[in-house]
Amino acid sequence: MMELIPQPRTKFLRVQCPECNNEQIVFGSPATVVKCLTCGKVLVEPRGGKGKVKAKILEILG
């Protein structure tokens, strides 16, 4: 059966920085590099679609 209302394929992720253990919510398909707000380490890099996550994923949010 066809979906009447399509759901988005993109998600938000709750990730934990490997350096300082700061938890941060990031977009799974970013257009720019996402850095940790505390220490500045790169958490997610854009890859032309879904981003390359370089941090531990704690939770996938809606």
From Swiss-Prot:
Belongs to the eukaryotic ribosomal protein eS27 family. Zn(2+) binds at C17, C20, C36, C39. GO terms for biological process: ribosomal small subunit assembly; translation. Part of the 30S ribosomal subunit. It comes from the Archaea. Pfam families: Ribosomal_S27e. Signal peptide: none annotated. Its cofactor is Zn(2+). Keywords: Metal-binding, Ribonucleoprotein, Ribosomal protein, Zinc, Zinc-finger. This is Small ribosomal subunit protein eS27. GO terms for cellular component: cytosolic small ribosomal subunit. HAMAP family: Ribosomal_eS27 (MF_00371). The keyword Protease does not apply. Gene3D superfamilies: Zn-binding ribosomal proteins. GO terms for molecular function: RNA binding; structural constituent of ribosome; zinc ion binding. A zinc finger (C4-type) spans 17-39. Binds 1 zinc ion per subunit.
